């Protein structure tokens, strides 16, 4: 994907986010159910890709990757309605006629950058949380686990409109192009050296990064 295509993708996601379509809880729940169905449909493909990339057994693939993702989806399906509710908070005396609430709100367009060692779990698990929170997401899986990255790309393309969730594959050139753009939140999992670079570049656009 070229730099121009990446920029157009991010702009398309931002426009989609501003429509407000991702905000209703019922939409988030529907998307989580759709993701779960797509994962279950492609479970064997995911298992095979993890074996090719990392030599993981069927047991390890499920217990350390796919099963944990499915568990996170189940958790979010159960708790997203309560997480999204307004929370009553104390009202200052000067505004005693009023009532005060804290309302959880999504960030907007998120970037998820994942590593090679747990390529399915550390890509899709953050995506589950991004969807549950009402965001859109661009996913950049690792170039060092190519078979798993390809399965993730095919799964996401089958499951979602690219204006909502999209995958950008490739290596350092694509990483650099992505980090030049404005994201509202960046979720990065990887080495400290790369994490520092992500942090530095994200601050140019005042993005809020999470490093892990």
Stretch-by-stretch model annotation:
Residues 1-101:
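N-terminal Rossmann-like NAD(P)+-binding subdomain of aldehyde/semialdehyde dehydrogenases
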Residues 93-207:
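Rossmann-like NAD(P) dinucleotide-binding subdomain of oxidoreductase/dehydrogenase enzymes
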Residues 208-212:
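Short "domain-exit" segments at the C-terminal end of structured domains
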């Amino acid at each position: 994907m070229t730099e121009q295509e990446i920029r157009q993708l991010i702009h398309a996601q931002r426009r989609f986010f501003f429509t407000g379509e991702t905000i209703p809880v019922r939409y988030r729940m529907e998307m989580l159910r759709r993701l779960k169905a797509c994962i279950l449909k492609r479970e064997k493909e995911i298992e095979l890709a993890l074996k090719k990339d990392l030599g993981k057994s069927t047991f390890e693939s499920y217990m350390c990757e796919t099963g944990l993702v499915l568990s996170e989806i189940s958790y979010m399906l159960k708790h997203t309605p309560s997480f999204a509710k307004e929370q009553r908070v104390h009202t200052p005396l000067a505004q005693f006629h009023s009532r005060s609430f804290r309302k959880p709100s999504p960030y907007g367009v998120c970037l998820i950058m994942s590593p090679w060692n747990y390529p399915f779990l550390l890509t899709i698990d953050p995506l589950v949380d991004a969807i549950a929170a009402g965001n859109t997401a661009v996913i950049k899986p690792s170039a060092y686990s190519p078979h798993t990255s390809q399965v993730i790309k095919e799964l996401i393309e089958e499951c979602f409109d690219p204006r909502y969730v999209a995958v950008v594959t490739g290596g350092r050139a694509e990483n650099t192009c992505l980090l030049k753009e404005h994201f509202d939140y960046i979720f990065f999992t990887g080495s400290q050296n790369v994490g520092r670079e992500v942090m530095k570049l994200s601050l140019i656009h005042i993005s809020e990064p999470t490093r892990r």
